[in-house]
């Protein structure tokens, strides 16, 4: 599973993108949604949570999560401490949802240039661009 979250303005309008693939790296699901006004780090956590929900809905029992947010990956892998209350609450929600995956869950950082992460980023930007165009028409 590849996820990305982004905010324009940080904080600003934000969206999440989710790309779920099977073991053969075939795309099973692509999705994006607006999540309101927030920061990039909150959007990254929200993207992961959205991906976990969709993976569960698809019947996944084990997932490998690929993110371009080194901060989120290192926090989830216990390498960085959480100092922000909002991120701590999101972190706790991720931990709670991990129990949905009896086969296990892993978190790995990938550079933004990797194809699947780049696609998740495109989904985020497409959702934000559509929202901004719609807002300008109003």
Residue spans of the language-model regions?
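RNase H-like nuclease fold core
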Residues: 1-42, 53-57, 61
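RNase H catalytic domain
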Residues: 6-10, 49-123, 128-132
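A generic short-segment signal for beta-strand/edge and adjacent turn/coil regions
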Residues: 32-35, 74-77, 135
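Loop-to-helix element that buttresses phosphate recognition and phosphoryl-transfer chemistry
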Residues: 43-47
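Extended, charge-rich low-complexity interaction segments
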Residues: 132-138
